[in-house]
Amino acid sequence: MFSKETYVGRRAELKKLVKSGIILLFGNNESPANFPANGFYPFRQDSSFLYYFGLQRDGLVGVIDVDNDVETLIGDDIDIDDIVWYGSVDSVKDMAGMCGVANTAPMKQLQAICGNAMKENRKVHFLPPYRHDTMISISDLLGIHPSKQREAASMELINAVVKQRSTKSQLEIDEIERACAIGYKMHTTAMRLTKPGVTEKFVGGQVDGIAQSYGSMVSFPTIFTQHGEIMHGNPSMAVLESGRLALCDCGAETMEHYCSDNTRTFPVNGKFDQRQLEIYSIVEDCHDLALKLSKPGVKYLDVHMGICRLMTDRLKELGLMKGDTEEAVRAGAHAMFLPHGLGHMMGMDVHDMEGLGQIYVGFDEETRPNLEQFGTNCLRMGRRLEEGFVITDEPGIYFIPALIDEWRAKGLHKDFINYEKLETYKDFGGIRIEDDLLITKDGCRFLGKELIPYHPKDVEEYMSKN
């Protein structure tokens, strides 16, 4: 964890932003894989609890009494049975000292703390829960049914957390750079191992092992597939075939729980064919345009629309699209090929803070999502960029047979899409290129000391040498 002063400072700023009431920040509990007495999923602490307290043990709740400036770490010390099986851990009091919290209390006192606050008509702030055990706790403590908890969550607290966590400190940037360094090794390992005859599972398993070997974990389930048209195509036992493209979307999460997230698409046999190169070069140029346009004050929605126009122009040159570019993009015809947004915030969550509500993280009062239009409704980030933001730049082009068939049968966007030509690409798959960007004072830069090869010649050269 960082120094205790880091967490003291973060909580002090949180109190200023929320102004009054009592804040509950729930840590996560262990999650049993089959039954509670034996076998848990790998523990992952709640990111907002980590941000303000830095403690990675299960069964903790942070309570911040804003009005009286009192902070309490709630939790129970483990008993001898736990010590026998899992070893000794720090006491709750010792953990409180690590993050600069003066007071501790056992879990049974949380009910009284919340009950007294409600009797005094004080606001009890909590974030939208995403785990069922947390929902049950909120129901028991505050009497709010789980189905009503998302709408009852504190907007003051949500806005404060988003404001603080959106702008990354140098400590956080350094951690993300560490994650990117591991991510580089993961991706270059995938490039080295990819060849005809090996399975997706083999490559994906080796990639995950790289993260584990650095004391890290994957920042999300690794995507490695020769069906790149499937957005979240997890590795299968399919054998890699010459002439196909392999798409690898993976990242690492450091021991301080900061993430990386990159995507590369490369030829299974190490050499792009002409048709693959034509599509790849469009995605490459869209990726580089986003890099050029992203800077403080620019709306990421405008960057997204800029790459959509470039993509449409280039697909028209290949005969896959037609008509007026502006009209095609306005109508959403480009979403046949790009049914998602350009990128998202990244930090302690790979899709940073989206559990708080995407509309509060990636948008603001000025920029709102278009929830009615296919493709655009998947835009995760549209707000104006600010110095210190960490975002992803991940354009792609996908040829999804089911989507092609559905749109063609309905006659959708027939003035903008050349369905006859498109039919010949049904076996193509998909291409995505993704990098992590830090918004700087006057532009942006790649995160990671070493850039994973993505220009076609660099990809081919790396694969041929390794």
Language model segments and positions:
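Active-site neighborhoods and metal-handling regions in enzymes and metal-associated proteins
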Residues: 1-466
